[in-house]
Amino acid sequence: MPRKHSEQLFRQAQKHIPGGVNSPVRAFKSVGGTPVFFHSARGAHLFDEDDNKYIDYVGSWGPMILGHNHPHVVAAVQAAVEQGLSFGAPTATEVAMADKVCELVPSMDMVRMVNSGTEATMSAIRLARGYTGRNKIIKFEGCYHGHVDSLLVKAGSGAIAIPGSPGVPEAVTADTLVLDYNDAASVTQAFKEHGDDIAAVIVEPVAGNMNCVPATENFLQTLRQQCDDNGAVLIFDEVMSGFRVALGGAQGHYGITPDMTTLGKIVGGGMPVGAFGGKQAIMEHLAPLGPVYQAGTLSGNPVAMAAGLATLNLISEPGFHQALAEKTTRLLEGLTAAAHAEGVAFTTAQAGAMFGLFFTDQNRISSFTEVMACDSERFNRFFHAMLDQGIYLAPSAFEAGFVSAAHSNDDIDATITAARKAFGKI
């Protein structure tokens, strides 16, 4: 499949854009090769600068649950644009959006709109610290919460955090405790040692940046119990899982109620939107009601709110998420059968319409350590074998995949057929 225009554009992009991309994973550094430059998308399909067509399982990294360019979402955006791009003032659309979010996510009494998932998690942590008067936070290895300094860390010696990126001073991460994902015992021990100082626990109930690793029920129940017993705030980062794992997010699926939730991706319908919210008692500490400051020039942007509201209304239709999950199951069962037919050690994970592909002989992956033990080089070869057949997967062994409502049975059948050939080559 020729991609000469992508190669030319990538060379040109590197002149003025660091690495030639505006977000690192897009550079194909994990899988090798040249990133694909796209010019348009419709439904479940992407079209690159050489007019090659791809079945898309990235979905702009999650937001495109309806598929690309859904006519109702496009119409809502066009109508909003005609009224003005931005006012920097309250609008009726942002009120309707807040009402809809709180309706769909019952744990959220109040919500504040922001411009990205990173901004949402950053603000939620600040608010939790302001509400509790404490400084320490717990996060889990392999969980990504945006490029916030205090959260961009990995586990060092024991639970002592060390910077995960140059430019992040150790002093900034000194109050961040990093524990193993799905390890309930480590959570209990951390609260035993630091309980009076822990402001919040932040967790992805479905970890989507170490591929796709759902939390165990016991793990989430332990988080809820320890936060209750010690007066800490439980934050579910549902930037990725929100409105995708289930209409009410992963928390609705698991039946575990957090104190705060962060949202992104689907909530903006493809526009740059994030949100954070939770219990009224906590949210009332946020300015202008309370002393914890947070602001944003483009927060609640009317065009973005129109896209998000149109998307949420469409995915609220009865049976939407069940049909999407069944479609995802059909895809994964087909991929697994294709791999095993070719003698390839392979397993999958699913959470609603999120999925993970693992090259391993283990039946289930539940921790960052297990993810790292998978054969990422074999994934890289699989990725390119699929790409050459017009199947666009996430260009990293550590990213989740997404199925949209626009994927047809023919799309899924074509993907499984391509996978059978790809498994045979790797």
Swiss-Prot record:
Annotated signal peptide: none
Cysteines engaged in disulfide bonds, as pairs: none
EC number: 5.4.3.8
Chief site of localization: cytoplasm
GO MF: glutamate-1-semialdehyde 2,1-aminomutase activity; pyridoxal phosphate binding; transaminase activity
HAMAP family (alphabetical): HemL_aminotrans_3
Subcellular locations according to the entry: Cytoplasm
Keyword terms: Cytoplasm, Isomerase, Porphyrin biosynthesis, Pyridoxal phosphate
Cofactor names: pyridoxal 5'-phosphate
Single GO biological process annotation from the record: protoporphyrinogen IX biosynthetic process
PROSITE patterns associated with the record: AA_TRANSFER_CLASS_3 (PS00600)
Biological pathway: Porphyrin-containing compound metabolism; protoporphyrin-IX biosynthesis; 5-aminolevulinate from L-glutamyl-tRNA(Glu): step 2/2
Similarity comment text for this entry: Belongs to the class-III pyridoxal-phosphate-dependent aminotransferase family. HemL subfamily.
Residues found modified as N6-(pyridoxal phosphate)lysine: K265
Catalytic activity: (S)-4-amino-5-oxopentanoate = 5-aminolevulinate
Gene that this polypeptide is encoded by: hemL
Subunit structure, as described in the record: Homodimer.
The protein's name: Glutamate-1-semialdehyde 2,1-aminomutase
